[in-house]
Amino acid sequence: MNSFSHVPPGFRFHPTDEELVDYYLRKKVASKRIEIDFIKDIDLYKIEPWDLQELCKIGHEEQSDWYFFSHKDKKYPTGTRTNRATKAGFWKATGRDKAIYLRHSLIGMRKTLVFYKGRAPNGQKSDWIMHEYRLETDENGTPQEEGWVVCRVFKKRLAAVRRMGDYDSSPSHWYDDQLSFMASELETNGQRRILPNHHQQQQHEHQQHMPYGLNASAYALNNPNLQCKQELELHYNHLVQRNHLLDESHLSFLQLPQLESPKIQQDNSNCNSLPYGTSNIDNNSSHNANLQQSNIAHEEQLNQGNQNFSSLYMNSGNEQVMDQVTDWRVLDKFVASQLSNEEAATASASIQNNAKDTSNAEYQVDEEKDPKRASDMGEEYTASTSSSCQIDLWK
C-alpha cells in the first residue's frame, strides 16, 4: 500500500522550483532528514513514465504532475554522458537549461527533457515531459553527471477546444431573420409601395386576435414574440416611408420644366414696311432686348433648378448619393447644350448685325456718289432682309 495515501482530503503537493531545489534537493544531497517526505526515490532508467503515476501518487486526489528523486548514472563507465534510456524509450534533452535564483543568488539549474518511444535516432515523440533540477552555483560551469536530482514529470497539456454544442443557437436564428429583413428592403420601388399595406393588414389581423378588453401594449407584454415582431414592423414601415418620400422628391426633381431656347421673333410686315434707314436700328435694338430678357429668364430658371437640386441633395441622405451624382451629370450636359445653343444664336446675330452695318455704310457711300446705283442696292437689301426674316421665323 502507498504510504502517502492517508493524507487529509484537499491536500495537494505543488512546490515551486525554488522550494524543490533549496529545501528538498539540498537536504537530500546533504543526507538530512525531511520532516514530511512526499518525494520517493525512483530509478528513472528502469521505470516507464506511465508507471510513475501509481508509484508517485499522493492521496486519492487526481494529480497532473508527479515528483521523485533520482540518482544520475553515467552511460559509460569512462564517459561523461548521462544514461537516460528505459526499456520502452529514452529521455532526450531539449532547449537550454534554466537558472533558478533565490534572493538574487543562483541555487540550481533546470533541464527539460521529452520522452521518445523506441530507440534513437528513430524514436517517436510522446506527450511526457520531465523537468530535472540539480544544484548549481555556476551558471556557466560544467554540469555534474553524477549525483542526486529531483524530477517533476507531467503530460503536455492540450489546448482546450470548445465544443460546438456549447454555443447558443438563438443568435444564428436572429441573424437569419435580419438577413431576410434586410433583403426585403432591397426590392423595387413598386414593391416598396405595396409592402406597407401588407404589414398594415397583418397588424389588423393581430388586433382581431387580441382578447376583448386588452389593449395592444398589454397584449404585446404578454407575448414577447409579438412585441419583437411589432418593433421590427414599425422600424421597417419607418424605413419604407422615408424611402418613399425620397423617391417622390427625386421624381419631382427629374420632372423639372424644360428650359426653352430663346427664339428671335420678327414680323415680315415690319421688315418690309419700315423705312430703310430706321428698320435696321430698330430690329437690332429689339433683338438685343429680346436676347437680354431671354438670358435673364434662362439664368433665373437655372438658379431655381440648382436651388431645388441642392435642397434635395442635402435632405436625401447618404442612400441616394450615387443617383444624385448621375443627376448632376445629366444637368451639366443639359446646361452645356443650352449654353452652346445660346452662344450660337448670339454669334449668328452679331454676324448679321455686322453685315447690316457694312451694307449701310456701303449704301451711304454709293448714295453720295451715284444716287441711281444706291436705289438699286436699297431694293436688293430690302429683298435680302425680308428673306432673312422668313428664315429666322423657321428657326
UniProtKB/Swiss-Prot annotation:
It holds the Pfam family NAM. GO terms for cellular component: nucleus. Residues 344-362, 382-395 have a biased composition (Polar residues). GO terms for biological process: cell wall organization; positive regulation of secondary cell wall biogenesis; regulation of DNA-templated transcription; xylem vessel member cell differentiation. Keywords: Activator, Cell wall biogenesis/degradation, Developmental protein, DNA-binding, Nucleus, Transcription, Transcription regulation. Belongs to the plant vascular related NAC-domain protein family. The NAC domain includes a DNA binding domain and a dimerization domain. Interacts with NAC083/VNI2. This is NAC domain-containing protein 7. It comes from Arabidopsis thaliana. The gene is NAC007.
